[in-house]
């Protein structure tokens, strides 16, 4: 059975999840990288997406930040850097598939995890089956999802699948809430496969998934693929699921916080770790291109009562640097793919050169 590698332009296809990922009944391995459109200027989207394709990958993944698209209650914005439709079209024109993670909570080291601040003025419990919260999500989805459903794969677009919530198993275990989010999506025309993503540990998988409702389960980790996939496989076996394995967030770097050392990861070690994932399943590199937390949208972690704000840069020590150019990590992973997965065609990446003045970039 010949594998499908890339999106065939202008041709509708069917994506299914069985014992493996299948496109039109042919086996498909997802090689995805995260590029958040809201962290990259629109004039640079093509550059970043092209470099993802040039690496040998076939899919782009992105979150959608509710607090940017509905900054005030009932006031919506899908223009400029928030034009998700234009972003997806750019990806499709390059032959890339897309994985969409459409809120309500995204984490992503983003202000309030993507939740709009005006929710705090409402009498509701966020990320729960509270009717007031679900109504707010429903109103947002009424505006958002009609922009996405025409771009589903079986409607001629490039969206393979969409996520329900985000790492909910690290927060709560309100299954009624997860089912309600799924229902809101399906009632508004989302017909593609749905999935959840959580840490691959028993407690988080039990709390954050809808495995008994046949919602596909993915895991998030940055190393030890053998161990983490084994944990997921055990969970699948317990629930009678014969699904493919996928790491939805393979952390190839890490975010940085004020007054803390910049975190770096060895390129060759990363390339080997990516190879170990691909030997068993599919991957989404988080991040492929981190970009920038524009304005005051950088998030904040906490350690006890101590706030640990992230910096403006979301470079993440990713495969592309903050401005979108290839790093040593990019070339190390590309060499690994060329050696072990030559069936995925590669190209020379684009590099943007800056003017120089007395040794400083302008």
Predicted regions, residues:
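Aromatic-lined substrate-binding rim segments of carbohydrate-active enzymes
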Residues: 45-111, 182-186
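Short, well-ordered coil/turn segments that N-cap beta-strands
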Residues: 29-31, 56-58, 92-98, 153-160, ...
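Noncatalytic carbohydrate-binding groove/subsite architecture in carbohydrate-active enzymes
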Residues: 177-274
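The substrate-binding groove and active-site-proximal loops of carbohydrate-active enzymes
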Residues: 30-42, 66-83, 120-139, 163-174, ...
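Carbohydrate-binding surfaces of carbohydrate-active enzymes
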Residues: 122, 134-149, 155-163, 174-178, ...
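Aromatic- and acidic-residue-enriched segments that line the glycan-binding/catalytic groove
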Residues: 74-80, 104-128, 178-182, 210-217, ...
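N-terminal carbohydrate-binding accessory modules
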Residues: 6-59, 89, 93
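Hydrophobic or amphipathic alpha-helical targeting/insertion segments
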Residues: 82-147
